Amino acid sequence: MKKISLPKIGIRPVIDGRRMGVRESLEEQTMNMAKATAALLTEKLRHACGAAVECVISDTCIAGMAEAAACEEKFSSQNVGLTITVTPCWCYGSETIDMDPTRPKAIWGFNGTERPGAVYLAAALAAHSQKGIPAFSIYGHDVQDADDTSIPADVEEKLLRFARAGLAVASMKGKSYLSLGGVSMGIAGSIVDHNFFESWLGMKVQAVDMTELRRRIDQKIYDEAELEMALAWADKNFRYGEDENNKQYQRNAEQSRAVLRESLLMAMCIRDMMQGNSKLADIGRVEESLGYNAIAAGFQGQRHWTDQYPNGDTAEAILNSSFDWNGVREPFVVATENDSLNGVAMLMGHQLTGTAQVFADVRTYWSPEAIERVTGHKLDGLAEHGIIHLINSGSAALDGSCKQRDSEGNPTMKPHWEISQKEADACLAATEWCPAIHEYFRGGGYSSRFLTEGGVPFTMTRVNIIKGLGPVLQIAEGWSVELPKDVHDILNKRTNSTWPTTWFAPRLTGKGPFTDVYSVMANWGANHGVLTIGHVGADFITLASMLRIPVCMHNVEETKVYRPSAWAAHGMDIEGQDYRACQNYGPLYKR
């Protein structure tokens, strides 16, 4: 099949159309703004897959309806998914704006004195507001000279934030969520809401029974040579942890090998179901070779699969990581227990950063007093107000061990295009594979076990659906915390020591849900959350506003909150504005 092209960023230079001196004097400056914007975006951004971002500039400056239509025709033919309109001068507001109702759009009005770029910006935004097509405002804080072609830091920040979020919107549109299985143990996020995916994300849901996975394994609908490669890779790289099962439930070497083989096969088959695999056509399985065009997936597993077959922990952990037997590659997004709403938070984080995402239970709040009582240790530093134990049954991306290093040598999780094979190997070396606990997983399996290094900035997110309101997003920026080994061991053994752990300390504001760490835990809307590397809550807020998903909880500084200009007309409290604007405009792809 022809590979679907990636969305591009459209740049729209708009200009005062009056000839006989006005337009002519502005052509070069206006087009240079467009070129500078395109140069910035192509230099600083990449798609989540690692490919370079492409910008498409209008063939001419846009002064009115005819040139706007010509620009739109070009953009439509080149898969432009978001637009940035730029101008240093007055132009004709509603005659020059981008009118596509679902395409994210921003306007940069040059802050200069010679020509009123700010006046056009205000006029165009008024037209957008009146027509119900929200747009983002970009206006530099300081006046620039007319011949200054530099992009100020504050303008650059907004251009990049808008573009990152807009690319995420455009990249999700038209894709699918592969729901492999149904509802897992009554978890609400696995009651997959087709209307949410269609109306807010522009996606479809592909519902597939888990028997399809069984069929592919049993009928050998996979690349057998790749399976041998995967087994050899696991033999070389997997370290195995202790088997905590009672002796009657422990498997012998032959049985353990069969469990490992099936776990790796599950990873291969789920991947093939998501994105297709041309190798399957070579063995006569043309239909299966196409895949389901899935940008994210979820696997029910418990309990209808896991009571008989190996659990999804190994498959999910490998798919969610930035590497496997084929080397370093783009991580997939696969939600444990088919928690589609956590899967959407994972998808957002991956699209914004290009990094792997850590799926976890928001398991336990440990107060400083409780930790001191149980271990004798007094918390300090980032952990002084208490910590949250983020832990799940082994499906978290192995990148979450944070054995990768940034340019200053600090532990981190990198975009996959920056990860070396040495760093991938270090993440594998930091991971143990522990036999699944029989009482939970009767069909066996292996859970990955690692401990996230401390002092790493993270953003924890979660999407929830509220009846009568729709989807909402929660955001909590904070850091991973490193505890003394003996303290970690005592706390970890009180739950399940065969699973991966991140000790998380959210940044507190002293207000509302961020009054203290207990309040963060108490206000979290579900049993799962996602960790995305870095303090990127502002990017999530911008993305959510594009999709019309209100943010019900965040600890991002107010100066970093960036939403469409029309939000300001919905009241004076910025969080109340968000709710009213999202309700007023409705989901991006209204259905």
Curated annotation (Swiss-Prot):
Q: Which GO terms describe its molecular function?
A: arabinose isomerase activity; L-fucose isomerase activity; manganese ion binding
Which Pfam family is an annotated match for this chain, by its short name?
Fucose_iso_N2
Residues the record lists as binding Mn(2+):
337, 361, 528
Q: Which GO terms describe its cellular component?
A: cytoplasm
Predominant cellular place of this UniProt entry's protein: cytoplasm
Q: What compartments host this protein?
A: Cytoplasm
Which prosthetic group or cofactor does it need?
Answer: Mn(2+)
- Enzyme nomenclature, EC number: 5.3.1.25
Which InterPro entries does its entry note? Fuc/Ara_isomerase_C, Fuc_iso_dom3_sf, Fuc_isomerase_C, Fucose_iso_dom1_sf, Fucose_iso_N1, Fucose_isomerase, Fucose_isomerase_dom2_sf, Fucose_isomerase_N/cen_sf
Q: Which residues form the active site?
A: 337 (proton acceptor), 361 (proton acceptor)
The alphabetized UniProt keywords are: Carbohydrate metabolism, Cytoplasm, Fucose metabolism, Isomerase, Manganese, Metal-binding
Report which superkingdom the organism of origin falls in.
Answer: Bacteria
Q: What class of enzyme is it?
A: isomerase
Q: Which GO terms describe its biological process?
A: D-arabinose catabolic process; L-fucose catabolic process
The subunit field of the Swiss-Prot or TrEMBL record says: Homohexamer.
- List the NCBIfam families hit by this protein, alphabetically: fucI (TIGR01089), PRK10991.1 (NF008220)
Family, per entry: Belongs to the L-fucose isomerase family.
Name this polypeptide is given: L-fucose isomerase
Q: In the UniProt record, what gene is named as encoding this protein?
A: fucI
